[in-house]
């Protein structure tokens, strides 16, 4: 997915109140913008870091700039939590994830469960309806290991329970972790930061929920799917090795 119009480079001054950040543009102008990420963003808020912003016009917008990318640990990392849904939908629609391919319809943000919305609903007259929950991942503590969540997420545990309900009802239920960085070659659930989520994850696996981890190639010009990676979890560590992304390279 290309960034159009092009992103604006800047230097991060501070991220605060979860939804706001201050930055210095290359012109020297200091701006305040919107941070579309409610997580802790551990390791991704260092003052002085090189960042990239999208720019939006509109009389109803309070802030013109949106925090999209940051340079951290020698790589470019996506922080906008809306991007993984778009990347996943694009990859599935193009047939780049073989096990989620061949569906005639890919719909986004459909009502289901307990007053929730499923990120992607895949339907086809000849196939089982598939519910896909997408989670944004950018947390890395160990080299090469992507982890989720980076803080306690009650909503995340609820989503796993609802996916389990769909599996119990005879549908396919999929948790797709989209990793907005290219320097990770494996994924695991971060149980030490959220034991409730880790427990819900194990329960979802036993109920038949499928789990995949898709890493992305991120640059200031575009975000593209770069391959499915193994999951460090008993019983599913090799799950993703069967499937390839056609755009991988």
From Swiss-Prot:
CDD domains reported in the protein's UniProt record: SfsA-like_bacterial (cd22359)
Domain of life of the native organism: Bacteria
Gene3D superfamilies hit by this protein: 2.40.50.580, 3.40.1350.60
GO MF assignments: DNA binding
Family stated for the protein in its record: Belongs to the SfsA family.
NCBIfam families: sfsA
Protein name: Sugar fermentation stimulation protein homolog
Species in which this protein is naturally found: Rhizobium rhizogenes (strain K84 / ATCC BAA-868) (Agrobacterium radiobacter)
